Amino acid sequence: MIKLKNLERRYPLGKEKFFYVLRDINLEIAEGEFVSVMGPSGAGKSTLLHILGMHDHGWEGEYSLNDTAVHHLKPKERATLRNEQIGFVFQQYHLLDDLTVYENLEIPLSYRRYSKSERAAMVADTLDRFQIVGKKDLYPRQLSGGQQQLVGVARAIIAEPKLLLADEPTGNLHSGQGEEIMELFRKLNDEGVTIVQVTHSEKNASYGKRVIQLRDGWVVNK
């Protein structure tokens, strides 16, 4: 599903000098895998995730997603591919404060060619699946941290993405809420969703099937 070849991310420091965030990354992630990316702070974990999610375009090398050569695509084409195939879950929830839960869930569907009635049906199904029907007219500020992250996960998967990317998804939650989110990830993976998560937690990593360790921008295991 994901293939990275000789991928690097660097920033200029001066004349012919660079700071490398990622170095010579060669990776393959198969469809249906649940992979955890781990390593110390500054290892390049979040940068790798943002490259996979096509939010960072300043890298060099080759990146293929489902046999599409991302490195050959223009930014607009990458955005289309991202909206069609990738869902995101962030540590800071990233819900839009001025929109209700219902409206937040509807956002990813606006990038697809769904009719109004189809969007309404998909939102209703998702509200029911995540047991948040009673929260649909509330705003993010009216929800607990766990509830906000639950809505964040629901929004990430409502359009049935092939790939789910999660950056420290339980970082702002207490242990019980974190376990609820990770059990949900396990269930989604069992249903066939490919998941790549960045985490510092060995416990969260244990929910996946493989760990990729980064150190100083290098992959030190696969």
Language-model-detected regions and their locations in the chain:
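Conserved ABC ATPase signature
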Residues: 139-143, 147-149
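Short coil-to-helix segment of the ABC ATPase nucleotide-binding domain corresponding to the Q-loop/switch region
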Residues: 99-107
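The feature captures the beta-strand-to-loop junction immediately N-terminal to the Walker
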Residues: 38-40
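A short, proline-enriched helix->beta-strand linker immediately N-terminal to the Walker B motif
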Residues: 158-162
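Helix-to-loop junction immediately C-terminal to a conserved catalytic motif
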Residues: 53
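Conserved ABC transporter NBD signature motif
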Residues: 61-69
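Catalytic Walker B motif of ABC-type/P-loop ATPase nucleotide-binding domains
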Residues: 164-167
